[in-house]
């Protein structure tokens, strides 16, 4: 379970900065130090933390706070999703956003920020069913 929790923590950080950096073309420092963007980063991280519960992984609000503060301390770097976008490579939207959205839906929890990032990056609305976006083991 500790490994699963660490994987979820990594996804929380990735979901917080990767998609928004691709939408805004901003590096991590800008995302976490501009209030409106920082609020979206933090909100996406909270949504991802809630999604972890579907897999039986408990992420506390204090842990999300710690991860957000860690990201704020990063040097200004381009995220992997921004680099992929700039190089014309396919973005890992299903793995990063789709899995969070699907789990939040199954739990009846909101994922508005994550859903809006999906829509912005795909230029299409979310399907009614997200079956197949993740496999539960």
Protein language model features and the residues they cover:
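Conserved anion/nucleotide-ligand pocket segment
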Residues: 1
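Active-site-proximal catalytic alpha-helix in oxidoreductases
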Residues: 4-32, 36-49, 76
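NAD(P)-dependent Rossmann-like dehydrogenase/reductase catalytic/cofactor-binding core
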Residues: 39-137
């Amino acid at each position: 379970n500790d490994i699963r929790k660490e994987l979820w923590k990594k996804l929380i950080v990735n979901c917080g900065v990767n998609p928004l950096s691709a939408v805004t073309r901003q590096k991590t420092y800008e995302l976490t130090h501009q209030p409106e963007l920082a609020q979206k980063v933090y909100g996406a991280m909270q949504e991802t933390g809630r999604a972890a519960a579907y897999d039986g992984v408990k992420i506390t609000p204090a842990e999300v706070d710690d991860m957000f503060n860690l990201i704020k301390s990063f040097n200004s770097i381009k995220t992997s999703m921004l680099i992929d976008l700039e190089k014309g490579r396919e973005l890992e939207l299903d793995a990063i956003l789709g899995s969070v959205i699907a789990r939040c839906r199954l739990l009846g929890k909101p994922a508005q920020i994550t859903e809006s990032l999906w829509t912005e990056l795909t230029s299409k609305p979310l399907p009614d069913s997200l079956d197949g976006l993740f496999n539960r083991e």
